[in-house]
Amino acid sequence: MRIIVNPTKKINGAALAPSSKSHSVRGLLLAALADGTTELTNVLESDDTSAARKVVEALGARLNVKKNNEFGNGLDIEITSTGILLTISQKIFTGDSGITTRFVLPLLGLRKNSDMPVQIDCSPQMRARPIKSFIETLNCLGMKIQSLNNSIKIQN
């Protein structure tokens, strides 16, 4: 097969990828680790991303959330953080968000005030999901995670 591609005029512009729950949650949690202000555009508006936003705030970051009027279907979020995670709240609720729960557990080991215990709770649906092997792995790495009846207690 032989294909010939002739040059055309320069293409200029931007393409906006559809919002993704997975990318949105990861972006929010990574922004909490950054020192300074991170801007996320077209963040998916969902229960999982709402849970992730609350977790990021509980870890000491400030969020400025605006509806994305340019494209009309996502959120624009400015996350300001020192890059040093602090536990502002002794209880963190992750709702139904498995990705938030699993990502925040190791992040809690990086807290400046990691000697202060923090309790993670989630929905009954999430409590039914397996997480024991993940907790055991994190404990082997030096974290002190204790599985309670309906929540998880973390202290380093």
Regions of interest found by a model, annotated:
Residues M1-N156:
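Structural preference for solvent-exposed beta-strand-turn elements
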